[in-house]
A protein has these predicted regions:
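Non-catalytic positions within long, well-ordered alpha-helices that form the structural scaffold/packing
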Residues: 136, 203, 211-212, 241, ...
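N-terminal metal-binding scaffold of metallo-dependent hydrolase/deaminase domains
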Residues: 1-54, 411
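Metal-associated gating/positioning segment near the N- to mid-region
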Residues: 64-127
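Short peripheral tails and domain-boundary helices/loops at the edges of structured domains
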Residues: 401-413
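Active-site metal-binding motif and surrounding structural segment of the metallo-beta-lactamase
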Residues: 3, 51-71, 75
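Metal-coordinating catalytic core of metallo-dependent amide/deamination hydrolases
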Residues: 112-127, 133, 141-257
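Active-site-adjacent C-terminal substructures of enzyme catalytic domains
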Residues: 246-247, 256-370, 385-387, 391-392, ...
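Divalent metal-coordination and catalytic microenvironments
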Residues: 8, 38, 43, 66, ...
């Protein structure tokens, strides 16, 4: 697809070629060109600059007067493919039940797993397609999608095959992750498994097929006191080393049990959640190459603390933002709202939030060579805003979709 965007009010997210991620004070710079143009050739960004340098050619042209253009959002942590909804649990929480109490009573992840077990791949894809179309309308161009609601080999592979089928149908880029350790199901307990032995079983049973069918690019586990502890994490680390699939770990959502330190030492690509942080965990992340992915919409929905964005940024950590889109703890995938929450609740600046939701999100998926910033040769995954005053307005005014159109691979969606 070839296209030229002209008269862009501001073109934002321009970072030097080869920039993998942004950390520290660099995160606070979202470079822009005012009154700009951008050309797309064969689905890639081929040129951009001020309108005074705009080439005269035969490319189809779109006038972006009074509109801003920036990279499409990269949501590096989601559970987009699931069955059914869980609003009944929302009602229970409003009456005082905690996330852990609902899970102990067979709700939560186990509830979703029961619904997945009775759903076909086609049904899972159909439900997820509706959600994905809404996300694209709100500006998401790339998103990681985890399994984890199967809880046995058959249904985990079903979810991963559904993610693959959805990716084949969509212009968005979906990045599949095998969430091998999400909750300990009743059948595993009946067979005498604990969190560690179940994790090893799931890895041993699923990884050969995952590799044969190219069903996942990352491994994940829910490392928490009442879910999967450090012995389970060690099995994930070993499997990552043997399979070549990098680690992305849920950790420190409710308790700090040392998972961050262990994941960083093992070279995990990202550690996600981080609502509860100790000095030891912060020290482990300081200056490391493991990306700290914060999920403010989960904190909002569950009423738990927000991740310490300012501390992480000031400690030279690479910070990304993502939605955690899932039916239980974050039933929404609008990255504009995530950016607003990051500013209002975690005191990130709009520039920091936009970088964390684009380039650093891409880095958390090993995709920053293709996605997340304006650079020649990158995929033409772009947002065109409505006629809003500034790019910062995306993070300021919430509750309204400020995206006029999303361009993916050079094609307007």
């Amino acid at each position: 697809m070839n296209l030229k965007l002209i008269n862009i009010k501001s073109l934002g997210g321009i970072h030097p070629e080869g920039t993998r991620w942004l950390r520290g004070s660099d995160l606070g710079h979202f470079p822009t060109i005012e009154n700009a143009y951008l050309t797309i050739t064969d689905g890639k960004i081929s040129d951009f600059g001020p309108m005074t340098n705009c080439p005269q050619d035969e490319l189809p042209t779109r006038d972006c007067s009074n509109r801003h253009v920036l990279p499409a959002f990269v949501d590096s942590h989601s559970h987009l493919v699931y069955a059914g909804t869980r609003e009944e649990e929302f009602n229970l929480r409003l009456k005082g039940a905690s996330y852990e109490e609902i899970a102990a009573a067979g709700g939560g992840i186990l509830n979703s797993a029961a619904k997945v077990s009775t759903s076909s791949i086609d049904q899972l894809v159909s439900q997820a397609t509706f959600r994905l179309e809404n996300l694209i309308d709100c500006g998401t161009g790339t998103l990681e999608v985890k399994s984890g609601y199967g809880l046995d080999p058959e249904n985990e592979l079903k979810l991963l095959r559904a993610i693959k089928a959805l990716n084949d149908e969509s212009h968005a880029t979906l990045v599949p992750t095998f969430l091998a350790a999400h909750a300990l199901p009743a059948w595993a307990k009946a067979q005498g498994m604990n969190d560690a032995s179940y994790t090893k079983y799931m890895l041993d049973e699923c990884l050969p097929t995952i590799k044969d069918e190219n069903l996942a690019l990352f491994l994940d586990g829910f490392i928490e006191r009442d879910y999967f502890k450090l012995d389970a994490l060690q099995h994930l680390i070993d499997a990552s080393s043997n399979s070549g699939l990098p680690l992305k770990i849920h950790v420190n959502q409710f308790y700090d049990i040392g998972g961050i330190q262990m994941a960083v030492e093992a070279g995990a690509l990202s550690v996600d959640h981080l609502e509860v942080m100790s000095p030891e965990a912060l020290k482990a992340l300081h200056g490391s190459d493991t990306i700290a992915t914060l999920l403010p919409s989960c904190s909002y929905f569950l009423g738990i603390p927000y991740g310490p964005a300012r501390e992480l940024i000031e400690n030279d950590c690479v910070v990304a933002l993502a939605t955690d889109y899932n039916p239980g703890s974050s039933p929404g995938g609008n990255m504009q709202l995530v950016c607003n929450m990051a500013c209002a609740k975690m005191k990130m600046t709009p520039a920091e939030a936009l970088n964390a939701a684009t380039l650093n999100g891409a880095a958390a998926l090993n995709l920053s060579d293709r996605k997340g910033s304006i650079a020649v040769g990158k995929d033409a995954d772009l947002l065109i805003t409505k006629a809003i005053p500034s790019l910062e307005y995306l993070c300021y005014d919430f509750g309204t979709n400020h995206i006029q159109s999303t361009i993916l691979g050079g094609q307007t969606q």
